[in-house]
Design a protein with these regions (language model features):
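Primarily recognizes the serine-hydrolase "nucleophile elbow" in alpha/beta-hydrolase
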Residues: 106, 110-116, 120-169
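Conserved alpha/beta-hydrolase "acid-adjacent" motif
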Residues: 254-260
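Alpha/beta-hydrolase active-site loop
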Residues: 92-114
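N-terminal cap/lid segment of alpha/beta-hydrolase-fold proteins
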Residues: 1-27
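Short beta-strand/loop motif that positions the catalytic acidic residue
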Residues: 247-249
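Short, surface-exposed "cap/lid" segments of acyl-processing enzymes
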Residues: 24-28, 32-63
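Catalytic active-site module of serine/aspartate enzymes centered on a nucleophile-bearing elbow/loop
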Residues: 284, 290-319
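Accessory cap/linker subdomain of secreted extracellular hydrolases
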Residues: 148-238
Length: 319
């Protein structure tokens, strides 16, 4: 079935997206809102930062259609046809992470209003950062009947960023490509940046270049501080106990840590939790076999992971 192009509004922004509603002889079908990961990632899961097709969310829509679920995926602000909407580049600093949460909530409303979609059976499936938004939407929200957390952001954002930068610094020091003293100076500057964001939501404009390249610039400060304030484990602990939840993680994912997702699962133990653990799947849910993920494999012409797809379909069947 082909996608139907749609638009919906959130605040001053008109968001562009795609809806699929399978034809069913049994009446209205359940609907799933698909939420993309971080950065300029569009409705299909493709990123403006990576040349080539990734297609993660498009694949999820295909699987959902096979299982009789409607889906909505959209170009979030800063991506795809939506672009920056009514904003100029200089306006970005005034936009917080709540902008993306509000858009997801509006998308859920829109999906529930579509003809052929059962508004009493709405689900949210988020990939990476999208999982954090799914957890946020699920707080005291009886409209949502289940959530999928796929390769999720499982710790506070700045904790993850710190761990990632620490690992990168360790690697270049071991390879003798960076003096220990400079690495220590970068770590000290990073600690100060995190403390500033958590204290008053600001960032210095003279941080070292490697930290600025990692996104630690004043224009991103508000969004970073707002997102970091959302602790995935605290949100998970507050979810209704009867909610079906899928949590997926792979040992080949270089953007998350299995132990972090395990800790998130501990906070979800009171829910109807399904854990999906994988060994051949990269962050964008492609099968990389026994090779190591480098990030270049995200846009490689690889099949989507059968170990993921089989587990995802089994979870959908249980709903």
């Amino acid at each position: 079935m082909s996608d139907t192009e749609i638009t919906f509004s959130s605040g001053d922004v008109t968001l562009h997206g795609s809806v699929r509603v399978p034809v069913s002889m049994r009446g209205a079908v359940p609907g799933v809102l698909l939420l993309a990961g971080s950065g300029p990632t569009d409705r299909n899961g493709d990123s403006a930062l990576l040349p080539g097709s990734i297609g993660t969310l498009r694949h999820l829509a295909d699987v959902l259609e096979r299982r009789g679920f409607a889906s909505l995926r959209y170009d979030k602000l800063g991506s795809g046809v939506t672009g920056l909407g009514p904003y100029e580049v200089e306006d970005v600093a005034d936009l917080g992470f709540s902008t993306f949460i509000d858009a997801a909530s509006a998308a859920l409303d829109f999906l529930g209003s579509r003809r052929g979609v059962n508004a009493d059976r709405l689900y949210v499936v988020g990939h990476s950062e999208g999982a954090l938004i799914a957890l946020t939407l699920a707080q005291d929200n009886p409209r949502i009947r289940g959530i999928g957390l796929l390769e999720p952001l499982a710790v506070r954002l700045l904790d993850l960023l710190t761990a990632q930068i620490d690992a990168q610094l360790d690697a270049v020091v071991i390879a003798q490509k960076l003096p220990v003293q400079i690495a220590d100076e970068l770590r000290l500057a990073l600690t100060g940046a995190v403390e500033s964001l958590r204290a008053d939501g600001t960032l210095s404009d003279n941080l070292p270049e490697p930290l600025r390249n990692a996104g630690l610039v004043p224009a991103n400060a508000k969004a970073l501080a707002e997102e970091d304030a959302l602790d995935p484990r605290m949100l998970a602990a507050q979810i209704d106990g009867d909610l079906p939840v899928l949590s997926s993680a792979s040992t080949k994912d270089i953007q998350i840590r299995i132990e972090d997702v395990d800790a998130l699962d501990d906070a979800l133990v009171h829910t109807r939790l399904t854990k999906l653990r994988m060994t051949h799947t990269n962050h964008v849910l492609k099968d990389i076999g026994t090779q190591q993920s480098t990030g270049a494999d995200y846009v490689a012409d690889l099949p989507f992971s059968e170990e993921f797809t089989t587990g995802f379909e089994a979870w959908l069947k249980s709903l």
